[in-house]
Design a protein with these regions (language model features):
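Short, well-structured N-terminal submotif of metal-dependent ribonuclease cores
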Residues: 1-46, 62
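PIN-domain endoribonuclease scaffold, especially VapC-family toxins
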Residues: 34-92
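Residues that scaffold the ATP/ADP-binding catalytic core of kinase and kinase-like folds
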Residues: 18-20, 57, 125, 142-143
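Active-site neighborhoods of divalent-metal-dependent phosphate/nucleic-acid chemistry enzymes
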Residues: 78-114, 120
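Short His-Asn-centered micro-motif
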Residues: 11, 48, 117-119
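Acidic, PIN/NYN-like endoribonuclease modules and their adjacent C-terminal/linker elements
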Residues: 110, 114-116, 120-162
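Alpha-helix capping/helix-boundary segments
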Residues: 15-16, 50, 104, 121-122
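Hydrophobic/aromatic ligand-binding patch that stacks against planar heteroaromatic rings
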Residues: 36, 106-107, 125
């Protein structure tokens, strides 16, 4: 499976939070989300749990930016109903059985989508190569690159900005 030009992506809620938590800053993670939103050839996938997470975090970090970004992502997102067999296949890789993480992984397994998440709970399923997952930092490096020296200084880890 290659990620050089993804066609299907699932953007975990922690990536969304990284993009919106400080609306005064334009983070690299924000740039990554905008990149995916602008690409007509990339389908953004979600599931019912992820939709609820996005809406909840847009309320926790209220700002026009958070509301607009949540709306843009959710308007573009194709909501996937996850089959039980994919949930069962993913469950053993999650200690403690975090249902949201299991559902996100199962969504990716069922559809072949690339998962972008900063959650370390996905490391076991990633290492087993059941799904393909990148951290936000890896995705930023791959698709949007670091900021130029003329832009806000910082690392390409989703926390940079002014």
């Amino acid at each position: 499976m290659t990620t050089a030009n993804p066609r299907l992506v699932l953007l975990d809620a922690n990536v969304f939070v990284s993009a919106i938590k400080d609306p005064a800053r334009s983070t690299d993670t924000f740039r990554l989300l905008v990149y995916f939103l602008e690409r007509a050839d990339i389908r953004i996938l979600a599931n019912e749990i992820l939709v609820r997470e996005y809406l909840r975090y847009a309320e926790v970090f209220p700002s026009p930016t958070a509301a607009a970004l949540a709306s843009a992502v959710l308007d573009r997102a194709e909501i996937v109903g996850v089959d039980e067999r994919f949930l069962k296949a993913c469950a053993p890789y999650f200690q403690g059985g975090n249902i949201a993480d299991i559902v996100h992984a199962a969504t990716c397994l069922q559809t072949g989508a690339l998962l972008i998440s900063n959650d370390r709970h996905f490391e076991a399923i990633r290492k087993a190569q059941l799904i393909e997952a990148l951290t936000a930092t890896e995705a930023i490096r791959r698709w949007v690159g670091p900021r130029s020296k003329d832009e806000d200084p910082g690392k390409a880890d989703g926390r940079s900005g002014a």
